[in-house]
């Protein structure tokens, strides 16, 4: 009887360990670099379940109205959620909001809907602030969605062209910059920014993969991401010491948690159509962002807690590629 009780106790303890401390093993590590916060606990629980099932984490883009919800979610489920703030760059409160996100241990800032072009000097204060605080910067690039209504909105995709990130990457060479949606429809422009900017990455969330699959044109990216890392040794027309072309793409969803699996399937089709080598695929799925955010893919733990000390170099040219 005593032996039976001991065995039962052992089983209960093992179950508790497995349930509360998920083990991530052979399944591919995925880091969703572009996931928007929900506004209730149901979203939290749904995301935890789906992302854990797929050995995935997500960078949660959070406006101030959902700040407390996401801050608690990160504390409760650090193996799933990585905090990113979201600000409107023309809002006078934007610098204060960035400071609050930073102090709370968030790792990045998302910008959307500028009233001027992304590379306008008006926004340089925000960009330099993020660089100094070690915050990843995500910029919406290209076309943006809207609904059918009669409410006037001052918003233009022309102010969010991917080419504007070129100036920001040069202005903030220690920062990590991510363009959302690969600049849809300005894909070639986005690619050329990548070619000369080792600190710039793009996700291909939104309608891009839907469009390319429907048009049977997934191989289009082979034509615009045409260079290789070694070419800089032979020609002055490609960055010397830079990453491989496809390494500039990072996985993201920009959808509800239920959309994760569908996005994984479409991204896999994209990788296969473009014959991306396996080692680079793993970086695109999550290893690149894990390196940037100091995440251990095996445990989902952050190896360098946030907030980072001011002056931290997210992109350190002297260590690049090591």
Predicted regions and their residues:
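Active-site gating/metal-coordination segments in enzymes
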Residues: 65-159
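A cross-domain feature marking catalytic cores of carbohydrate-active enzymes
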Residues: 33-37, 62-63, 85-89, 110-115, ...
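Divalent metal-dependent hydrolysis catalytic cores, especially in the metallo-beta-lactamase
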Residues: 29-35, 46-68, 81-86, 107-111
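Active-site environment of divalent metal-dependent phosphoester hydrolases
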Residues: 38-41, 65-68, 90-93, 117-118, ...
């Amino acid at each position: 009887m005593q032996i039976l009780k001991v065995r039962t106790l052992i089983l209960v303890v093992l179950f508790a360990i497995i349930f509360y401390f998920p083990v991530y093993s052979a399944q591919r590590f995925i880091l969703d670099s572009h996931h928007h916060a929900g506004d209730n606990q149901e979203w939290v629980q749904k995301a935890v379940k789906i992302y854990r099932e797929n050995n995935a984490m997500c960078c949660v883009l959070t406006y101030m109205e959902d700040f407390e919800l996401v801050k608690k979610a990160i504390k409760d489920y650090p193996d799933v959620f990585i905090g990113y703030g979201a600000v409107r760059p023309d809002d006078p409160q934007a610098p204060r909001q960035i400071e609050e996100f930073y102090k709370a241990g968030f790792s990045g800032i998302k910008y959307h809907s500028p009233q001027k072009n992304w590379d306008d000097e008006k926004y340089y204060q925000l960009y330099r602030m993020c660089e100094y605080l070690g915050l990843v910067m995500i910029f919406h690039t290209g076309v943006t969605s809207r609904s059918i209504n009669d409410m006037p909105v001052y918003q233009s995709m022309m102010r969010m062209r991917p080419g504007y990130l070129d100036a920001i990457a040069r202005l903030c060479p220690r920062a990590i910059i991510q363009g959302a949606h690969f600049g849809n429809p300005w894909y070639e422009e986005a690619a050329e920014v990548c070619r000369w900017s080792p600190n710039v990455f793009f996700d291909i969330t939104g309608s891009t993969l839907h469009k390319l699959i429907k048009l049977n044109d997934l191989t289009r990216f082979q034509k615009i991401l045409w260079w290789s890392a070694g070419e800089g040794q032979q020609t002055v027309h490609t960055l010397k010491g830079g990453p491989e072309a496809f390494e500039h793409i990072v996985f993201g969803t920009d959808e509800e948690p239920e959309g994760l699996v569908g996005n994984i399937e479409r991204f896999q089709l994209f990788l296969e159509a473009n014959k991306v080598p396996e080692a680079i695929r793993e970086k695109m799925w999550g290893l690149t962002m894990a390196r940037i955010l100091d995440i251990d893919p095996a445990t989902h733990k952050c190896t360098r807690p946030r907030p980072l000390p001011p002056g931290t170099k997210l992109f350190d040219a002297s260590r690049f590629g090591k």
